[in-house]
Swiss-Prot record:
GO terms for biological process: heme O biosynthetic process. Its main location: membrane. This is Protoheme IX farnesyltransferase 1. The keyword Transmembrane helix applies. The gene is cyoE1. PROSITE patterns: UBIA. Belongs to the UbiA prenyltransferase family. Protoheme IX farnesyltransferase subfamily. GO terms for molecular function: protoheme IX farnesyltransferase activity. It comes from Pseudomonas putida (strain ATCC 47054 / DSM 6125 / CFBP 8728 / NCIMB 11950 / KT2440). CDD domains: PT_UbiA_Cox10. It comes from the Bacteria. Pathway: Porphyrin-containing compound metabolism; heme O biosynthesis; heme O from protoheme: step 1/1. Pfam families: UbiA. Converts heme B (protoheme IX) to heme O by substitution of the vinyl group on carbon 2 of heme B porphyrin ring with a hydroxyethyl farnesyl side group.
């Protein structure tokens, strides 16, 4: 009985791992930010709960498809070789059915508790990541994460539209921030894992153009990100608190990118990658704090 329970528990964990829960949580933080930034009043509990649940389920479904398509690549890379599909703990067909179930349930929740526009935008994001990026761009071009990054940048727009019911300039600006953040975030990881990507024949920028070229582009995109992150203040979407935070966080990111560009230390790339995660989290927290501070003035 104990053995059977341990197998079932492991299988449950395997399916949870397929959804990339840590990535989904970061996406939902930006979705939540989009929801609260969209209104000067409170967000209804049904939209808050079921809207984010629907977005999260669809994101999880897209992640499962990514695992299925990349299972052979994952088996070749040290970072991913222990994933459930790469090790054969979960078969492709059950995984695809699981992905379909997640996506369908997520779409139903969005259609029932938010609005049709949110549901269709979420579906477009899902297909962009699971089909366009995973199925084609990842293996086709070193600009894969630049083009495919748009799908991953959608959550704040989805959260905003779930509350407002329409698309406006402000949520598109939030999308632009994540879009500019994506290349330095992923290219830093790609430098750290360059040999693994080369072994798996994935044309990441460090593999096709070299580390020096990639580091320069990380630096350039970080400069673009710093400029873009100041736009919410420029259009009076946010106030001085956000401006100070965006400058401090952005300049620190720029320092990481500069150190990476100038340094040959092996840990500089992974340090930049890790900072980029905290950067995005802190930037959206700053947006929220500033938003509600302005409302109370």
């Amino acid at each position: 009985m104990a053995t059977l329970l341990s197998v079932r528990r492991a299988r449950w964990r395997d399916y949870l791992e397929l959804t990339k829960p840590k990535v989904v949580v970061l996406m939902l933080i930006t979705s939540l930010a989009g929801m609260f930034l969209a209104t000067r009043a409170g967000v209804s509990w049904s939209v808050l709960l079921f809207g984010n649940l629907g977005i999260g389920l669809c994101a999880g479904g897209a992640a499962v498809v990514n695992h299925v398509v990349d299972r052979r690549i994952d088996a070749l890379m040290a970072r991913t070789h222990k994933r459930p599909l790469a090790q054969g703990r979960v078969e492709p067909l059950p995984a695809l059915l699981f992905a379909l179930a997640l996506a369908l349930l997520g779409m139903v929740l969005l259609l029932v508790f938010t609005n049709a526009l949110t549901a269709w935008l979420t579906l477009a994001s899902l297909l962009g990541y699971a089909v366009l990026y995973t199925g084609f761009l990842k293996r086709a071009t070193p600009q894969n994460i630049v083009i495919g990054g748009l799908a991953g940048a959608a959550p704040p727009l989805l959260g905003w539209v779930a509350v407002s019911g329409h698309v406006s300039a402000e949520p598109l600006l939030l999308v632009l921030i994540i879009f500019a953040w994506t290349p330095p975030h992923f290219w830093a990881l790609a430098i750290h894992r360059k040999e693994e990507y080369a072994k798996a024949d994935i044309p990441m920028l460090p593999v096709t153009h070299g580390e020096r070229y990639t580091k320069l582009h990380i630096l350039l995109y970080t400069l673009i990100l710093l400029a873009v992150s100041l736009l919410p203040y420029a259009i009076h979407m946010s106030g001085p608190l956000y401006l100070v935070c965006a400058l401090a966080l952005g300049l620190r990111f720029l320092q990481w990118a500069w150190v990476l560009y100038r340094s040959s230390r092996p840990h500089a790339a992974i340090g930049t990658f890790k900072y980029s995660i905290g950067y995005l989290f802190a930037l959206f927290i700053a947006l929220l704090l500033d938003h509600y501070l302005l409302l109370n003035l």
